[in-house]
């Protein structure tokens, strides 16, 4: 039982509702008890947490090479990482499965153009992407710098965390028309996905995301 000794504004001891009264060095103190928070584990909630965790794992792996340079400047009231998570989580929720999500994944969401036209993989794991050099939009420039993401998923995989994702800030100019990156963890049966983005040399503009499924025969 709680005892209030000096009226409602005075000192008291023990528990009153969700508040506990006590004393510390002769000073009357009050503290609230922690709320009992349920941790629901419905099928939908478990699935939601799983997809969020998978996206977070991907994002953390490409944070310095892709997300920071292509998201931080444009994020509003949150970090670039959190905005990237938010955009892709909504997209994954809307399409409902990994197979349909992967070709639509967003690694940059800006005004510059990006158009990957072809891609090959060598036996040594070198991925070569060819891209259009035409200046399509008002802010496109020959000096725009290429960014590349390579995603690898085992054949038939339905989980993002079963694969690997690599990000590259290549520094290769749009005018070059081709870029090469090395990924030495590609197995013969893997599905290999590439994403091409650009950022202006002064960092003011970023492009859309151009997706290309690579032939891993």
Protein language model regions, located:
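Long, polar/Ser/Thr-enriched low-complexity segments
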Residues: 1-116
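Charged linear interaction tracts used for macromolecular binding and regulation
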Residues: 74-217
């Amino acid at each position: 039982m709680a005892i209030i000794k000096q009226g409602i504004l005075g000192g008291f001891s023990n528990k009153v509702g969700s508040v506990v009264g006590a004393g510390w060095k002769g000073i009357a103190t009050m503290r609230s008890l922690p709320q009992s928070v349920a941790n629901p584990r419905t099928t939908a909630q478990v699935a939601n947490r799983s997809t969020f965790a998978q996206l977070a794992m991907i994002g953390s792996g490409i944070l310095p090479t892709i997300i920071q340079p292509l998201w931080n400047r444009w994020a509003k009231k949150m970090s670039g990482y959190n905005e990237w998570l938010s955009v892709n989580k909504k997209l994954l929720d809307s399409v409902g499965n990994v197979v349909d999500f992967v070709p639509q994944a967003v690694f940059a969401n800006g005004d510059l153009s990006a158009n990957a036209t072809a891609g090959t993989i060598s036996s040594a794991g070198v991925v070569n992407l060819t891209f259009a050099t035409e200046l399509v939009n008002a802010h496109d420039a020959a000096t725009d710098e290429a960014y590349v993401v390579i995603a690898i998923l085992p054949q038939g995989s339905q989980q993002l965390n079963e694969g690997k994702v690599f990000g590259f800030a290549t520094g290769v100019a749009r005018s070059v028309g081709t870029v090469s990156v090395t990924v030495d963890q590609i197995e013969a049966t893997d599905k290999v996905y590439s994403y091409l983005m650009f950022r202006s040399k002064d960092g003011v503009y970023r492009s859309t995301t151009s997706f290309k499924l690579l032939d891993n025969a």
